[in-house]
Amino acid sequence: MRTTVAQFSAPRAGLPLQPMHSNTTSHFFTVDVEEYFQVKALESAVTREDWASRPSRVAASIDALLEMLDRHNARATFFVLGWIATHRPEVVLAIAAAGHEIASHGFWHERVTGLDREAFREDVRTSKQALEDLVAAEVVGYRAPSFSIVPGLEWAFDVLVEEGYKYDSSLFPIHRRGYGYPASPRIPHVMQRPAGRLSEFPLATTSLFDYPVPAAGGGYLRQFPLAIIRRAFREASERCEPATFYIHPWEIDPGQPRLPVSALNRLRHYRGLGSAMERIELILQEFSFTTIASYLPVLDARATTRTTAGAA
């Protein structure tokens, strides 16, 4: 029987994750689990105090994604807000029961650029605890809202290590206003930080005329030609290196309420909502996907081999 959110209308514990083992040619399908009213483009129209009174729409989108992933025998990593874990626990339980990885997206969807070290620590600690208490499994991954770990905020990696995370997936190897980490390697890699080792899974990019182009999904899936996304993942497959794709539940929900925001933010948030599901279907048909956590042993072994070779 297919797993749906409705099966988990009351919180339950003891649902272990069952990540699928992958080889180096499988890519990473990731979902940033948040409500439509929690995103940056709409924050001028909705305050945090309004969240609880807004109609929730995340469950239907999660059901659609779970069905699609199951049909393509794909496993995914879901970066979930702590707020979702406390307000819509059945959504998180359904994801875990379907065999996908649960990871952290912070608690309040606060960008790291607006937090100091201790506020960031509190955010990643409380979100990790909320998720682990709910699904009774360890949470080892984190993604910053809006990919907001940028140059100058490298201390965030040390906090993640100190709080028990094993990997991050916040770096976009591009330069964009508000986010981007151009110096990041484009492939999964291990960082040696003062606090310890942390694996990094950057978002997928490609190059046009030697210029790095974002090609990981999300708004780029909705607004760029699909050929750009396909190119990035084909290039990664040819290199036998996994690439990271992402999507938000609200991006496959064309029926969501339209909020009064600027023309630019309307374009960013609402354009392409009606075609996103079809495009995701095409991506899943062409490429295989698994969880990020399932690749950690492979990446760790490669990093250890390189370190040993370098010391010889």
Name each region found by the language model:
Residues 21-101:
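Active-site beta->alpha N-cap acidic-glycine motif
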Residues 48-56, 80-81, 108-120, 145-148, ...:
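The substrate-binding groove and active-site-proximal loops of carbohydrate-active enzymes
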Residues 21, 71-72, 223-312:
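C-terminal domain-boundary segment and adjacent tail
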Residues 133, 137-140, 144-241, 245:
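Active-site-adjacent pocket scaffolds in enzyme catalytic domains
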Residues 62-66, 89-92, 121-128, 157, ...:
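Generic structural signal for well-ordered alpha-helices
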Residues 16-18:
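Short, positively charged and aromatic/hydrophobic N-terminal segments
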Residues 32, 69, 105, 142, ...:
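Conserved, mostly hydrophobic/aromatic
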Residues 72-153, 165, 170-177, 196-197, ...:
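Metal-dependent polysaccharide deacetylase catalytic core of the NodB/CE4 family, i.e.
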